[in-house]
Amino acid sequence: MIKERKTELVEGFRHSVPYINTHRGKTFVIMLGGEAIEHDNFSSIVSDIGLLHSLGIRLVVVYGARPQIDANLAAHHHEPIYHKNTRVTDAKALELVKQAAGLLQLDITARLSMSLNNTPLQGAHINVVSGNFTIAQPLGVDDGVDYCHSGRIRRIDEDAINRQLDNGAIVLMGPVAVSVTGESFNLTSEEIATQLAVKLKAEKMIGFCSSQGVTNSEGGIISELFPNEAQARVEELEAQGDYNSGTVRFLRGAVKACRSGVRRCHLISYQEDGSLLQELFSRDGIGTQIVMESAEQIRRATINDIGGILELIRPLEQQGILVRRSREQLEMEIDKFTIIQRDNMTIACAALYPFVEEKIGEMACVAVHPDYRSSSRGEVLLERVAAQARQMGLRKLFVLTTRSIHWFQERGFTPVDIELLPESKKKMYNYQRRSKVLMADLG
C-alpha cells in the first residue's frame, strides 16, 4: 500500500517547532468562561489543554460559572441581583454559586485528568490540583448597596501555586474563595485570572469568547491591540450596553495584565476547534493579541539579518523580479536596508540608496513574504524609507521595477524618462531588463 504524503502536516509541524521550544517551561493562565464550558467544543479545548501540559507548559486554569449560576438561581426561583453590573451575592445565592462552581470543578478535573485518553499519549498521568491559593475579601457597600458575599482578591499564595506547577500539576481555580475569617465569597473569573497572571509573572493569559477575537467594523479579526486600543474597545462596547460578554470581561483583565508585565494576552473562540493550538503554534495565530510590545517590528537591518533577507529575496531573484545580490554585496550594503520582522522572521525588506548631490534616493530590493502581500507591509516600508530619505535632505525618491508599476503609481509615483536618473545610476541601467523608472516628490 502506498501511503499518502501529507505535505500540509509536514509544513505545519516545521512552523510549530520553534513555538514548542519557546513555550516550554513558561507559565500560561487560561481563563475558561462558563459559556465556553457549556459549548459542544469544550471537550476539544480540554484535550488541547492536556496537550499543552504534555509539551512542558506550566498551566493555571481559571474557570467561571456565570451561566451555570444563573441557571441554578432560576431553577430555585431566586432572582439575580446586580448593582453597577456586578452580581450581589446574598446568603441563598452564595449556596447556589458554591453548588454550581463545585460541580464544574469536579467535571473539569475529571476531564483534564483523562484529556490525553484516545491520543498517542494515552497513559500519561495529569495531576490536577485545586486549593485555597487565594484569600478573598468583601466588595463591601457601594451607594448603600451591600454586595454581601460578592468579593475580590485580597492576596494570592503564588509560592504554593509555583510549587504545584514545579511538580508538574495543572492548577485549577474557580470563582469561590475564602476570607481570613473563613467566609466564602463569589469572585469574577477575570479578576482571578488577571491577578494570577500578574503574580505568577505569566508569559500569557488566554481567554475564550464566542467570536474569533476582537472584530473591526467590517467583521474582520483584529490580530493585535495595544492596551490603550483594547481599553477604547471596552468603552465602546460598554457604551452599547455590553458589560458582561466574554470579550468585554477578558479585555478588561488583559489591559490590566499587560500594563502589569504580562507580555501577551490572547482572545480566541471557544467555538473553533483547535483555536488554542492555532493561536499558540503559528506565526499569525487565529484570534486577537493584546500586547505591550508588538510581535512585529520595523527597524534598520544589521549584519545578523542577512540570512533572513536572503531567504526572503532569493525566490524573487530566481523569478527575475529582483536583481540578484550576493551575500558579500548584501553585507557591504546592509546599512541601507530596513526590515519588518514578525516573531524573529524577516517578512519584508527594502533598501534606500541615496544620491546626495542630486538630492534623490532610490528605493530598491522591495520584498514582502507571500503570506503578507495582501496586507499593508509594503506601504509601511515605503513610508519608513520615504521618512529616512527626507531626514537625509533628499527631495525625490525613485524606483526601478518590472512588475509593480501600478502599485507604485497608486502611491504617488509617476513614470519618468531614464534621463532623469542620477548620472551614476544611468550608467548602470540594465537595458536588457528594461525596468520602468517611477519617481515621486517627497514634499
Curated annotation (Swiss-Prot):
It comes from the Bacteria. Gene3D superfamilies: 3.40.630.30, Acetylglutamate kinase-like. One of its GO terms (biological process) is L-arginine biosynthetic process. One of its GO terms (cellular component) is cytoplasm. Pathway: Amino-acid biosynthesis; L-arginine biosynthesis; N(2)-acetyl-L-ornithine from L-glutamate: step 1/4. It is found in: Cytoplasm. Its EC number is 2.3.1.1. Residues 296-443 form the N-acetyltransferase domain. SUPFAM superfamilies: Acyl-CoA N-acyltransferases (Nat), Carbamate kinase-like. Its main location: cytoplasm. Keywords: Acyltransferase, Amino-acid biosynthesis, Arginine biosynthesis, Cytoplasm, Transferase. PROSITE patterns: GNAT. The keyword Amino-acid biosynthesis applies. It holds the Pfam family Acetyltransf_1. GO terms for molecular function: L-glutamate N-acetyltransferase activity. It catalyses: L-glutamate + acetyl-CoA = N-acetyl-L-glutamate + CoA + H(+). Coiled coil: none annotated. PANTHER family: AMINO-ACID ACETYLTRANSFERASE, AMINO-ACID ACETYLTRANSFERASE NAGS1, CHLOROPLASTIC-RELATED. Homohexamer. Belongs to the acetyltransferase family. ArgA subfamily. This is Amino-acid acetyltransferase. It comes from Salmonella typhimurium (strain LT2 / SGSC1412 / ATCC 700720). The gene is argA.
